Amino acid sequence: MTDNPNKKTFWDKVHLDPTMLLILLALLVYSALVIWSASGQDIGMMERKIGQIAMGLVIMVVMAQIPPRVYEGWAPYLYIICIILLVAVDAFGAISKGAQRWLDLGIVRFQPSEIAKIAVPLMVARFINRDVCPPSLKNTGIALVLIFMPTLLVAAQPDLGTSILVALSGLFVLFLSGLSWRLIGVAVVLVAAFIPILWFFLMHDYQRQRVMMLLDPESDPLGAGYHIIQSKIAIGSGGLRGKGWLHGTQSQLEFLPERHTDFIFAVLAEELGLVGILILLALYILLIMRGLWIAARAQTTFGRVMAGGLMLILFVYVFVNIGMVSGILPVVGVPLPLVSYGGSALIVLMAGFGIVMSIHTHRKMLSKSV
């Protein structure tokens, strides 16, 4: 008696990838533990964090049930909604810490720029899937317009860090479509030539100051350099095994700013040490490798470039946050994915993982349609 190779397993029926789900749950538990410490054992914040995790998991499960071809069909509508929301932010968005990035609808407050991190790669993947790969020069130009329209709207908030990530979320999808290295080389040269224009004419004074603080934070230890100095102290004092959960001096004595959001990695490093850092990095590596494996097995161009693009941008999120907190990159306000406190970012990330699981678990259906 032999097993039926076409027989669906439980995970096939619920359209979830158990390996990815297990890694995600481990990261979310890790996040909850560090948030509890970073918040000073704030019960209210912890309750909200658990609610965000629960909502994120529900959205991921729901998104995983929807076939990839539906996402491909929805992409233009989501993209248009995203553009409208970004314009709405510019018109009557809520101002926080000098930036106009939020829409406050009374019952919910969110950042439309987070939606762009899903809407842009979806739209570019849909556009690419309807063309031969690699895309023609004309269609590459159209794809770039689709990428940079929302990017410029986010940059105008101003939010340079998020705008770069939005651009990269689309550019990675375009890269995975098989662009020639010659074209990529030309793009790199153009970007390099644009940097002086960005520095002298487009960046705000505080953004330039952040870059300068990267070189010499001690020049303003109580002002612009304070964040990175305190973060370095926290990371360096953690040692091999850390000071112990809930026993970090920089975090518990509130020397470390934004310790539950952008600088949560410093809290983790101080309290759990190098061992805790390596566990976190191992989970991220496993998650990204699993996502790239799913991308490699996808049966359509849409599935391949979408899953691959989401995993590459996840790597960039992790790299930028850890680099920022460690003092090797400027402070740009990028949270640590799946770990930092924040509902909008977590829900969008979990939605992205739901799409990746959908691409994986619907691959048999896709192979029949090709």
From Swiss-Prot:
GO terms for biological process: cell division; peptidoglycan biosynthetic process; peptidoglycan-based cell wall organization; regulation of cell shape. No effect on activity by EDTA indicating that the activity is not metal-dependent. Its EC number is 2.4.99.28. One of its GO terms (molecular function) is lipid-linked peptidoglycan transporter activity. The chain crosses the membrane at residues 20-40, 50-70, 75-95, 112-130, 136-156, 160-180, 183-203, 263-283, 312-332, 336-356. Disruption phenotype: At 42 degrees Celsius, mutation causes formation of spherical cells and mecillinam resistance. Changing residue 97 to A: No effect on glycosyltransferase activity. GO terms for cellular component: cell division site; plasma membrane. InterPro entries: Cell_cycle_FtsW-rel_CS, FtsW/RodA, RodA/MrdB. It is an enzyme of class 2 (transferase). This is Peptidoglycan glycosyltransferase MrdB. Belongs to the SEDS family. MrdB/RodA subfamily. It is a multi-pass membrane protein. It is found in: Cell inner membrane. Residues 41-49, 96-111, 157-159, 204-262, 333-335 are periplasmic. It holds the Pfam family FTSW_RODA_SPOVE. The gene is mrdB. Changing residue 111 to A: Significantly reduced glycosyltransferase activity. The keyword Transmembrane helix applies. Peptidoglycan polymerase that is essential for cell wall elongation. Also required for the maintenance of the rod cell shape. Functions probably in conjunction with the penicillin-binding protein 2 (mrdA).
